[in-house]
Amino acid sequence: MGLEKSLLLLPLLVLVLGCVQPSLGKESSAMKFERQHMDSEGTGSSPTYCNQMMKRREMTKGSCKPVNTFVHEPLADVQAVCSQEKVTCKNGKSNCYKSSSALHITDCHLKGNSKYPNCDYKTSNYQKHIIVACEGNPYVPVHFDASV
């Protein structure tokens, strides 16, 4: 009797796992933003910061990402930008917001002679306003548009 129940429940289990599984490994836009742009604990002060972080945050897999910015502020402060000054995004969309104050950021630029898989970055630290695109519910950053 136990075996019959197990055999009857197996197709149901397969069906449920088939529906749930595809979403398990999928990184949301908000999670991708955090992985690619947030470093609340860091300062970016080391000359090798960008080389280390770009690799650690998986932005040198398959190719070298040419430019990236890390924000060294609490996540809540960056999320709050989504309720600050509304501006037009570089792509013309209207879901971008500019921070009301300058934030501590690190820009990483791929050096001209650098070739994959040896991605070599120039590290530059700034205090600048950031512009982020926001989406979702809750309304959170999903794209780093610029720093000004």
From Swiss-Prot:
Bridged cysteine pairs (disulfide): C50-C108, C64-C119, C82-C134, C89-C96
Gene3D superfamilies (alphabetical): Ribonuclease A-like domain (3.10.130.10)
Organs and tissues of expression: Pancreas.
EC number annotated for this UniProt entry: 4.6.1.18
Active-site residues annotated for this sequence: H37, H143
Signal peptide, first to last residue: 1-25
This protein's name: Ribonuclease pancreatic
Native organism: Gerbillus nigeriae
Lineage: Eukaryota, Metazoa, Chordata, Craniata, Vertebrata
